[in-house]
Amino acid sequence: MRRSILNLSRFLFYPKPRVDETQLKCRFKGRWVVITGASRGIGAALAKRLMRVGANLYLVARSEAELQALCDEAQAMNCKAVCCALDLRDRSALNSLCHNLEQLPQVDYLFCNAGKSICRKIADATERLHDFDRTMDLNYRSVVALALTLLPALRQTGGQLVYTSSVSTLYPPAPGWSAYHASKCATNVWCRTAECEWKPFGVGVHVAYLPLVRTEMSMANPHYRSLPAYSADDAACILLRLAMGHHFSYQPWWSRLTAPVAWVFAPLVRYFYQKSVL
């Protein structure tokens, strides 16, 4: 019975995303695509999808071995591929990356997929200001730095910026997630502003409010392991469809119904939560 319920939940709440391979090849073949968080999970799935249609890749992540393997795979498919292993939280390394990106012949797409998730209550983080520094540096500052660096190139090509956010940011703040949600919401707002300001330049900005995706990072939380989730490849398809379309954002259909309701009942939920911890 439980398996049947899970299968039904996957079917209803995580419908299989489809992407037109012909359209994908038309839009991405020969284009330069920058992907952060490219060594694993969604970023790696995105890179594999794009190399199969002939895109040129600039891959950024911390894991050098995995990045090099992806670059070798792309080059074996006659794609140009560059890998850059660094920590985007390191400001000097980020500055160096930005300088190198300025040397690219062109940039057509920037997929900002690198991210860090921390679940810790604020009272337990009084000696851990670095939790907030790390999430803001990676989830917010690195996105802004790369986008500002590549804006001139994106203007020349009519390029697109796609940011991987979380559907949880559409709901009332949840206890334990202050560092993560604050950093993701900051980037959501920045992208909304950039979308308004950059559209006259011909540059598209998109935000993907993804639901749970089965990756190494998300599955580190034992509470998520038995829940329905998209695969990394499913999430990559969602990002690609968003990049090829005209919508500012993607969000699951069910969040359009449940998020407004959650905000209505948020005061009541907070009340009972506060009572439960007294």
Task: Give the label of every model feature segment.
Residues 1-32, 273-278:
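Non-catalytic terminal and boundary segments that flank Rossmann-like NAD(P)-dependent oxidoreductase
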Residues 117-133, 176:
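Conserved mid-core segment of classical short-chain dehydrogenase/reductases
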Residues 32, 39-40:
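Conserved glycine-rich cofactor-binding loop
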Residues 53-70:
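Conserved glycine-rich Rossmann-like NAD(P)H-binding loop of the short-chain dehydrogenase/reductase
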Residues 147, 183:
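Active-site helix of classical SDR
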Residues 207, 223-259:
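C-terminal helical subdomain
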